[in-house]
């Protein structure tokens, strides 16, 4: 099963992570869905209930519908995960909405950032609050626009930009090898201390 159309905007131009990058890491779309749900929710057992598996439907359909279904399954899985965390996302968005404007707009994740995210997903998950994680998936991996992400999450574009900046900053710390700094609290924003402690152990 191909991941070429997993996200409709994941197309390679040499700067951003492509569908091929995702395919090379995960192997098939089942693994992508598991990683998405687990990264967003931080609980493997809880994540299972949010995975929308299109496999049985896909077996009886043609290639074009098959490709669309893979894309849909990924989007539906993320949406289901969001519904379980909506209250927390909205609460965090109010906090992020009170900050200063982001000076430089961030691009979708690079191939290097994508690889760092996958290789260090537990550490990044512990560093980022749930809003940052959803924004990282929608804006960074799926390459949705800031406006589209804001609409899907029901928050302001400025909150999306600040949350995404935090996510990219965390990936930059990893790229620079500043792992200990990555483990420290930052900006006063909320993040999961229990997950952080587990990642240090």
Whereabouts are the PLM-identified features?
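A short, charge-rich alpha-helical start-of-domain segment used by transcription regulators
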Residues: 2-35, 45, 59, 64
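Pre-recognition alpha-helix immediately N-terminal to the DNA-recognition helix
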Residues: 21, 32, 123, 133-134
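Σ70-family region 2.3-2.4 aromatic/basic alpha-helix that recognizes the −10 promoter
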Residues: 30, 48-101, 164, 168
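DNA-recognition helix of helix-turn-helix
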Residues: 147-189
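Internal acidic/polar
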Residues: 88-115, 188-196
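Short amphipathic alpha helix immediately N-terminal
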Residues: 125-148
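Short amphipathic alpha-helical boundary/capping segments
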Residues: 10-13, 109-113, 119-129, 156
